[in-house]
Design a protein with these regions (language model features):
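Acidic, metal-associated active-site segment
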Residues: 57
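Exposed, interaction-prone extracellular/peripheral surfaces
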Residues: 2-44, 60-65, 74, 83-119, ...
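N-terminal low-complexity, intrinsically disordered segments
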Residues: 68-78
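A positional/architectural concept
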Residues: 48-52
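Active-site SXXK
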Residues: 124
Length: 313
């Protein structure tokens, strides 16, 4: 996988100009419902469920109708079961949920996770625009969660990039504790569930720290009616501890001291991350969520292009 040598001028921050410049490269990133395929080993691949479905009308329930489409409001008023009918929307909504929590402003190699996430989100924003899809999503940090309703056109992509580069969490000066990270991610998933309509494509870009059982529950429900692609970002030091010694790491503007003299401590460190990643990928596979694994030293543009390959029906 290519080292970080893309357009970023800083490994710790992004500019709107840099993200706008990705429009041309994004033209070759495939987002068609039937062709997104993760090439990461062991990943689950499922065909996308298609474009968004827009409510058309309700009619009396008939044998064979999907019980999940029962119109409970009309049913309650008429005292007779009614089912919702949908028509296919011309444009499929694409929602990108980008993680800018304090834990994302970290790297020992390459660029911050937040930089890799922003470049990935920007490329997908432009790819959605080039396909004629409507673009919206969630951009969230430790305490600021912004909802962006889907719209069409170049302005929709520019709006997303503007909110991405102007998000207040780029100025964070501390790292939240585990419980706050968990709450921030949960609130973002809850917000996502409120704005997403059935038949959408959802892209989640995160390191998934604090991915609680409640967050899993909400995301599993979203996966029933939508197609989800998760982009999991980690730093190489999370996979394998450095050689024996004492090291000072910088997360946001905080210093973290780690001691790796003990072999047992090094093994426990590596095994802890492997277990977390294994549980995460197992969850993705169980619910048909496609995924890509990126690191802070990769080129996110090339990773997206190489990981998303055409799949004929």
């Amino acid at each position: 996988m290519s080292q970080v040598n893309f357009l970023t001028s800083s490994p710790v921050h992004v500019t709107q100009r840099e993200l706008i410049a990705l429009s041309g490269k994004a033209k070759i990133i495939p987002l068609e419902p039937n062709i997104i395929k993760s090439l990461q080993a062991g990943s689950y691949v499922s065909q996308f469920k298609g474009r968004g479905m827009e409510f058309d009308e309700s009619r009396p329930y008939q044998p064979g109708d999907d019980p999940r489409n029962i119109d409970w409001r009309v049913t309650a008023r008429s005292n007779q079961a009614y089912t919702k009918l949908f028509r296919e929307e011309r444009e499929r909504p694409v929602y990108i949920m980008t993680d800018l929590r304090s834990n994302m402003h970290f790297a020992t190699q390459g660029s911050f996770k937040s930089v890799i996430a922003s470049y990935s989100a920007a490329c997908i924003s432009w790819a959605a625009h080039h396909r004629g899809d409507r673009l919206g999503g969630i951009i969230y940090g430790d305490s600021n969660c912004q909802e962006i309703k889907p719209k069409l056109g170049r302005q929709a992509a520019l709006r997303y990039l503007h909110k991405l580069t102007d998000h207040p969490d780029w100025k964070t000066s501390f790292t939240e504790n585990d419980s706050n990270q968990e709450i921030a991610l949960l609130n973002a998933v809850i917000s996502l569930r409120k704005i997403v309509r059935p038949g959408s494509l959802i892209i989640i870009v995160s390191d998934f720290l604090g991915f609680s059982q409640k967050s899993r529950s909400y995301l599993s429900r979203l996966s029933q009616y939508n197609d989800i692609l998760a982009i999991f970002i980690n730093d190489p030091i999370e996979e394998k501890s450095p050689p024996p010694g004492k090291y000072r790491l910088i997360a946001s503007k905080n210093d973290i001291l780690i001691d790796t003299h003990s072999k047992q401590a090094r093994n426990d460190y590596s095994n802890s991350f492997k277990l977390r990643r294994s549980i995460l990928f197992e969850f993705f596979s169980r619910y048909g969520i496609n995924y890509i694994n990126m690191t802070t030293k990769c080129n996110p543009i090339e990773s997206l292009i190489s990981s998303l390959k055409r799949k004929n029906k």
